[in-house]
Regions:
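Repeat-blade elements of multi-bladed beta-propeller folds
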Residues: 47-55, 93-117, 143-170, 196-225, ...
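Aromatic (tryptophan-biased) beta-strands that constitute blades/sheets of beta-rich domains
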Residues: 43-93, 127-143, 179-188, 235-274, ...
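Sec-dependent signal peptide cleavage junction
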Residues: 35-43
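C-terminal membrane-anchoring or membrane-association module
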Residues: 599-611
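Juxtamembrane/start-of-transmembrane alpha-helix segments at the extracytoplasmic/lumenal side
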Residues: 580-592
């Protein structure tokens, strides 16, 4: 009778604490990985708290429930359909669609739509919990930001999720209620030396008492900058500028040039009022130990003749390291000198530790739109490997890794009626993922060209230039796996459509990708074998995330919908998972634990009877 009683008790415990044991075992398995993965964050394996999982932007989740062994069995949990919105008061119809990787935190999914809206959705059943919808008709400069309305990131900090709206106002929203608990309005107003316009698709970043933000505006003549504010007082702590003020600045960057790979150049950028660009885009990374902020800067404004901005144009198209407390430049590495091809870095910078010649080195990993991977020492900015080229041979690019031997007076007029490859959108546009000393990089195979036309720029009509994709030739996408220890290519695959803005992620030996046509791919990280592919027949413009609902059940969540880049339909949010009860090897582990518990209980009972 005692044995039967113990057996029943063990089965009851198994049933009651199954979910808890799932979590415990996942955490224990995660601990086993600590010595083997290149970067280990303190983030919960059940949450996806940042756009690329952690503040280092690795895009790697250590969960093991959804794995290479069962990803082929992914099943639909739920779909959330976003509503379309009305045109603005002045009949401007901005594009729709979603470019924001969803966040998953404590059983709630957070996502932003193109219209500056933030939604909180129950991860268990896809039911809406709350939404934040600012009145975008009240925004200033509607004719500017409405062309670039898409949100590209959210950030969770303490008890709030943060969004930066298109006109650069930052809101902190209570995670549970959606109430506004923090507001910092129009952070891109009154930027010194600026005579252009901005829009702001990226959420702020946090470090101690600092809120760090920036805005984009290369196409609208905005001056590149990064700002830090005191979270308590909301006062500006520092500005850092990546380009000189409109009209130029004598000896711009002359003294700071020694901190990077470019020699000082007199009269860099020249002295025209058209000067602009180098705005920081993509995700930034933070190293708390050295208190360093790592970021990427975009190309110089290319709406006017590049010959009017002579020089390397520091600090555009660069990897940049700043002292996070003061905004002081620590080092920079310029990828594309005097950039006229828009060969600036892709979606994000990654901070990680890699092993090179059996020595661990802190490294910054970034890729350019020209299909080069840069592996840079995080402390010094020096190259660990020479720039690593991947993909097809480039065609007709200017100043391709030529640094100080670049043509400092080149003009984009050479591309009028001609093509160059990769295009101004890449190559690499979407974000890579880094896991266990390997970088997984998405690229699109498409060429670009330049047209001349009159356009409005900085409040006047100029004879300017616009960049366009060459879609008369076949296009497709590729994914490359590069060993960061050796710089060697491990494998590559080609898929039918381009990977334009959906970042890659890695988890449990599976690489996840979504192409423009809306095909969801699960790929074996060892050899590039496609383990699963699911067509959704709608624009894929944002990457997936992996996290758990309130019961601890793991799921993959991703948005779909849009047209070209942002799109013309509001989109959906998709949740998929595997049947943990039948597919997961945890059941065998749990049974083993139950059996051990039963044996232990029997032994204890015998000892008590004997005593």
């Amino acid at each position: 009778m005692n044995y039967f009683s113990h057996y029943c008790e063990a089965l009851l415990l198994y049933s009651m604490f199954r979910s808890l044991l799932y979590k415990l075992l996942t955490f224990l398995i995660f601990l086993l990985f600590v010595g083997n993965i290149s970067t280990v964050s303190s983030e919960s394996v059940f949450d996806w708290k940042y756009s690329a999982f952690d503040k280092y932007n690795t895009g790697f989740s250590p969960q093991t429930v959804i794995s290479k062994d069962n990803v082929k069995n992914l099943e639909l949990n739920w779909i959330y359909q976003f509503d379309s919105v009305e045109p603005l008061d002045d009949d401007i119809v901005p594009p729709e669609g979603i470019q924001t990787t969803p966040l998953i935190y404590q059983g709630i999914v957070y996502v932003a739509t193109g219209y500056n809206e933030v939604y909180a959705i129950d991860a268990m059943d896809g039911s809406p919990l709350w939404s934040f919808k600012p009145d975008i008709n009240d925004f200033k400069n509607t004719e500017v930001w409405a062309k670039r309305l898409a949100m590209r990131s959210l950030t969770i900090h303490e008890d709030a999720v943060y969004v930066q709206t298109s006109e650069c106002s930052i809101y902190g929203l209570d995670l549970i209620t959606g109430d506004v608990v923090f507001e910092l309005p129009e952070t891109c107003s009154n930027i010194p030396g600026n005579n252009g316009e901005y829009f702001s698709p990226f959420a702020p970043t946090f470090y101690n008492n600092l809120l760090i933000t920036r805005a984009q505006g290369n196409a609208f003549g905005g001056r590149g900058y990064v700002s830090a504010y005191d979270l308590e007082t909301k006062e500006l702590v520092w500005h850092w500028f990546s380009s000189p003020p409109a009209g130029g600045e004598l000896n711009w960057g002359y003294d700071e040039a020694k901190l990077g790979n470019i020699l000082p150049f007199e009269n860099d950028w020249g002295y025209t009022n058209y000067i602009a660009g180098g705005t920081s885009w993509g995700l930034v990374a933070i190293d708390e130990e050295s208190e360093t902020l790592f970021l990427l800067t975009g190309e110089p404004a290319n709406q006017f003749d590049a010959a009017l901005r002579p020089g390397p144009n520091l600090f555009s198209s660069s990897i940049v390291a700043l002292d996070i407390n003061s905004g002081t430049l620590k080092w920079y590495y310029q990828m594309s000198t005097h950039d006229i091809n828009n060969n600036d870095p892709g979606w994000k910078v990654v901070y990680t530790t890699i092993s090179v010649n059996d020595v661990d080195r802190k490294a910054i990993i970034a890729a350019s739109k020209s299909n080069y991977l840069y592996v840079v020492d995080a402390l010094t900015g020096d190259l660990i490997h020479k720039p690593i080229h991947f993909g097809p041979e480039s065609y007709n690019l200017t100043n391709e890794n030529t640094e100080n031997q670049s043509d400092m007076y080149a003009s984009q007029t050479k591309y009028v009626g001609e093509i160059f490859c990769p295009s101004q959108l890449g190559g690499v546009f979407a974000g890579m993922s880094v896991a266990d000393n390997v970088a997984y990089i998405p690229s699109q195979n498409v060429c670009g060209t330049v047209l001349t036309r009159q356009l409005e720029y900085k409040g006047e009509v100029i004879d300017g230039y616009v960049y366009r994709l060459d879609l008369d030739r076949p296009t497709n996408g590729s994914i490359y796996a590069i060993d960061l220890s050796t710089s060697e290519l491990k494998w590559q695959i080609t898929i039918p459509d381009r990977i334009q803005s959906a970042s890659l992620i890695v988890s449990a030996d599976v690489l996840y990708s979504i192409d423009r046509s809306g095909i969801f791919y699960a790929i074996d990280i060892e050899d590039g074998t496609i383990l699963n592919s699911i067509p959704f027949n709608s624009m894929g413009s944002a990457g997936p995330s992996i996290g758990a609902d309130a019961k601890g059940s793991m799921m993959v969540v991703f948005p779909m919908g849009g047209g070209t880049l942002t799109g013309n339909n509001p989109g959906i949010l998709v949740s998929m998972s595997v049947d943990e009860s039948s597919e997961s090897s945890y059941d065998y582990l749990l049974f083993a634990i139950t059996l051990v518990s039963l044996i232990y209980a029997t032994i204890v009972t015998r000892r008590r009877i004997k005593n």
